Amino acid sequence: MSRSRAWPSFVAALVVLALGALVAVGVGQALGLSYEPADTPPAAVSAVDLDPLVPAPAIATIDVPAGEQVALAASAVSDALTTRGLPAPTVGVGTGDADLTVSLVPPFTDSAEAYRVRTAGRLVLEASETAGAAAGLYALADRIRSGAALPADGAAVEPRLGLRLVDSGSVGREADPAAFATGTDYSLNTDVVAGAVLPEAPWVDQDVVDEIDAQFRQLVQHALRHGYNGVVVPGFLEYVTFSGVGDGHEVYPEGDPHVARAEAMVEAFGPVFAYAQDMGMHVYLLTDMLAVSPPLEAYLERTVGGLDVDDPALWSVYQAGLSELFESMPFVDGLMVRVGEGGAVYQAGWDFSSRLAVTSQSSVQAMLNALLETASAHDREIIFRTWTVGVGAVGDLHTNPKSYEAVLGGIDDPHLIVSTKYTMGDFYSHLPLNPTLETGSHRRIVEFQARREFEGFGALPNDLVADEAQALQQFLAANPHVEGVWNWTQDGGPLRAGPMTLYLRTGFWQMYDLNTYGTARLAWDPDLEPSQVTGDWVRQTLSSDPATSTEITEALARSREAITRGLYIQPFAEQTVKALGLEPPPMMWIFEWDIVTGDSAALDSIYEVSRDGLDVAIADGAGAAEVSAGMREQVASTSPDTWHSPELYRSFVDALDYETDLLGTLAAYRETVLRHAEWLDTGSATAHDQWRAAEQDYRAARAAHVERYSGDLDLPAYLFTAADLGSDRADRDPAMAWAARGLLLAVVVVLVLGFTSARLPGAAALRALVVAATRPWRLGDVPAPTTRADRVLVWALPAVVLVLSRCVYTWFAAPAHLVATLGAWLVLAGVLRWVVRGRDPFHLWAALGGVVLLRTVILLVALVVRGPGRYWFGFWTDPAARTAYITVAFAAFCWLFVVVALVLRRAYGLGTTRSLGATLVAGGTALAVVAGGVAVIGLERALTIWNDQMALLPWGLSRILGITVHLGIPPSSAGVLAVVGIVVAAVGVALALAGRRAPDLTVAATRL
């Protein structure tokens, strides 16, 4: 009889184990930590051997052709001469003999920017077009400022890359100390003109427009002097009325303020941006797609049925808007489009946003074909950015040549330019060069970032000239279609989470102006010696003293070593890693920008990848700090009197002090987390002692760093909140391991006592719990006790074990996890108690308590090794252990419902159908309540609270785009689960009612 009653339970056990195995495999595939060596290029090295300073040419008079463009370029020569201590020359038009004469001659190359300088006798600069005359004057000014020799006599000079773009710099951005002081504003909007927008007529604040105009002119003039010939300005929908759609009022009805505002914007900002074209620069507007406004979205809903980005009818609306833009702003050379990120600009009178909708191969092609048709009709260009960053089916378009060819290979249009970041990912170090830039037949431009967002936001010395030279040389050798660069002087990353440096305007912006200068010089001639380019910039920006400029240039030559060793854990950084279905960046331990992470997912994975080179990885941190200290000593040894200003000297030395302090702090933290992970992995006493010693160093260094730099707008302290959360939990691992051992021993003692016939108070309760945990099909045979001690102990003991074990599991630091876990148990128990209302609940409590003890034993076995830290270390890094644990743990979770159904049937006689129904009601209600609570709170907020307390995933996820966005979790998931719970409960109610109306088949068969 006993065997016949047991075999269904054995079958159920096999089924739940199989389910557990399936879940374990699915989790393993979702996590999928894998890595392989990345094709990281060797470190670019450029020996410092600067050319000697050359005396500035004696130029007292300059004769130039008529025109503002050339006159502005001539003023650059004048300023260069005065910088070298010479009198400002007289600039005239058609004055005849002059010390420097600019002449327009017949073409001698294919480039409109070509020029040549004749140095026999008086200087003569020859060019075939105004663009060449201006380019030649800017180049002469640069040579004079740098103390460099002039071009060879009569040699034609033309740019290797004909399109050299900059972003809009800091134009339109406010140096707001209060906004920057918080250091936690991770908003990514880069709009230029929003500060001038008014909520009502006249729609724009002319005083703000004038300020933006002055800032834009400053940017244009500086960029021209560096050698750029184009600028990219955010904007599209704010200048469009869609007057070309239907009768002109279909998108924006008559009287809609969008129309008057757009017209006012064109009138106000058209002349501002046209200045760039007047001075010889290309002007491109930049937009995300799909760009929308509420009326536009409503119109598309009415006419196209929504945001159907494959429908030509949708794109015809944008074609009309683009055509209007080209007509109302004729100086605009084209539109730059990005589809991989989106967002909104929300403020008074401003309601434009974008949707991540163009995510398939067909939709990208439909968009480009439509926009190119309009651009071709107006002889303009479309620049398509391949920055798709994992979005949709085109998520790897940015880095995968096969995807690039599949999406773009069929588009052949001379008006299309494809723009791509130079690295195989974002602007990090240690990444391979982007292979898609070596393929394809389209016109290509290469994107660079001067103010490296992930490497201190430009606050740290970071000479990228040699790296960029290496990249350009490789791309040009492989792809003849590379024809330009786009340098980000200010853009990239959050606007106000780093130092308050605004390009050309606020803070020590000169630190990253080096890279802006270097990119332009290399775009003209990629074969230049990088250290000489850096030296030229140093001489004209910081110091022209030969000894001082050499010391500074040599220090900058070491800057990449300090950055690449100090901000990266090299064994990890030089691997191509995949985890959680994503490709983590090479700087996961700082996630992102200035957030030093403390989560186990990142840190344990970094250790796993770096395990074989652990000592080197740790030594790199201290080595980087030593390099920075050496740079500081080298620069500080120069005399401030030899610099162009003492303020520049002080700013540079302060930056090196900051870097040395930061890298030293990070070095101590690096050793702390890696040695902790080593201890979790091996249990080594040596690793434990090294972890503890490093942690003491880290806490002292961190406190000093925060005290010194907290509130410093120029050199802000890094954010260690996440690191502290992780360190606090790591510190508790040894104690939690001992607590788990003690609790496990107590549970084992309880189980042993339950197996014996010992006559102790509560013995009946212990026997019932043991039977429920090991042979639940026999629980109905256990007699109900007669003592109050047994009736209390049968539920109180499992409750205490449940609470204590989950407290240990969460380091006594995650009440959110306890609320969710204990809440689910309470709801389940409450519903089941209602089901057996009017009856003795002893067997029900025994059933639930037995499963609690069983599941707790499984959990504690995983915790006794080295606490929750080791539990999660195995989860992230050990596929075999993870699979085994999840299989058993999930099976035990499912086993709960098997046991509940058994006890309802065997102990309370509910019958098969009613027992199943009641079990579904209890389980569904618990799911609905917990998931519903999460939905009410908000899934993103709930996950943030939980993750902040558990420190499992990067703390920065929720501070930037959100955990749900990063991991692709639909925000409605909690609500959907709540509905599922309600449906399950409803099915359970139906089954329970059906079971009451009809005799159970098994019982009926027994009666026959």
Feature locations, PLM:
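C-terminal non-catalytic alpha-helical accessory regions
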Residues: 38, 180-187, 484, 489-728
